[in-house]
């Protein structure tokens, strides 16, 4: 079907988002056209503001509008434990369960040789710098239970073995091949309780 160029451009923009195909993009584009102009301008401003005002925490790599982020700035958190996750959305999922009171480290990906992504391409070097702090007693590896997540967890555990820091892996109450962001709070809580040393 042929659409006017502004609709086609809008649809193309929506299709750049994950999980949005042509039908969903058309539905969203026509929804936007039906919105009040003020609402469309607010929506556009929110997108631009988020892109301009958010960055990554210089300590843990979590997305934030302040540096360091609210988690790293919270003096009540247990600074002897660092939970390593793949993405910022995993931090948000872990925080929803309200059981973990330590700190986080966001890798921004996983090791994936098939995609040409090695350890130096994700946030592992910064993790190693953080672990030079003598107060760190445990690193919890909470990468996703898929091939890349397991490979990344195994790589980090082998890297840390000589350090004497306790390295644990969250239990697999999570489905193999699943993502942390889609797990409910109870499943995540049980996975944290059942973590094991690696």
Swiss-Prot record:
Pfam families, alphabetized: RecR_C (PF21175), RecR_HhH (PF21176), RecR_ZnF (PF02132), Toprim_4 (PF13662)
Domain Toprim stretches: 80-175
Entries under Gene3D superfamilies matching the protein: 3.30.60.80, 3.40.1360.10, 6.10.250.240, RecR Domain 1
Keyword DNA damage: yes
GO molecular function: DNA binding; zinc ion binding
CDD domains given in the database record: TOPRIM_recR
NCBIfam families noted in UniProt: recR
Family that this chain belongs to: Belongs to the RecR family.
Role according to the record: May play a role in DNA repair. It seems to be involved in an RecBC-independent recombinational process of DNA repair. It may act with RecF and RecO.
HAMAP family named in the record: RecR
Name used for this protein in its record: Recombination protein RecR
Species in which this protein is naturally found: Listeria welshimeri serovar 6b (strain ATCC 35897 / DSM 20650 / CCUG 15529 / CIP 8149 / NCTC 11857 / SLCC 5334 / V8)
């Amino acid at each position: 079907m042929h659409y006017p160029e502004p609709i086609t451009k809008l649809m193309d923009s929506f299709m750049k988002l994950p999980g949005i195909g042509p039908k969903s993009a058309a539905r969203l584009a026509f929804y936007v056209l039906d919105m009040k102009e003020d609402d469309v301008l607010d929506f556009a401003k929110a997108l631009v503001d988020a892109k301009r005002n958010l960055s990554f925490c210089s300590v843990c790599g979590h997305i934030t509008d302040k540096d360091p982020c609210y988690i790293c700035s919270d003096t009540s958190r247990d600074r002897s434990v660092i939970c390593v996750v793949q993405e910022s959305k995993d931090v948000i999922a872990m925080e929803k369960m309200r059981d973990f009171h330590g700190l986080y480290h966001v890798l921004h990906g996983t090791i994936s040789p098939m995609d040409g992504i090695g350890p130096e391409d994700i946030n592992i070097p910064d993790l190693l710098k953080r672990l030079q702090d003598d107060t760190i007693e445990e690193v919890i590896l909470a990468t996703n239970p898929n091939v890349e997540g397991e490979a990344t967890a195994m790589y980090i555990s082998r890297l840390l073995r000589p350090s004497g820091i306790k390295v644990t892996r969250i239990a697999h109450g999570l489905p193999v091949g699943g993502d942390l962001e889609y797990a409910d709070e109870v499943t995540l809580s049980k996975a944290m309780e059942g973590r094991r040393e690696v």
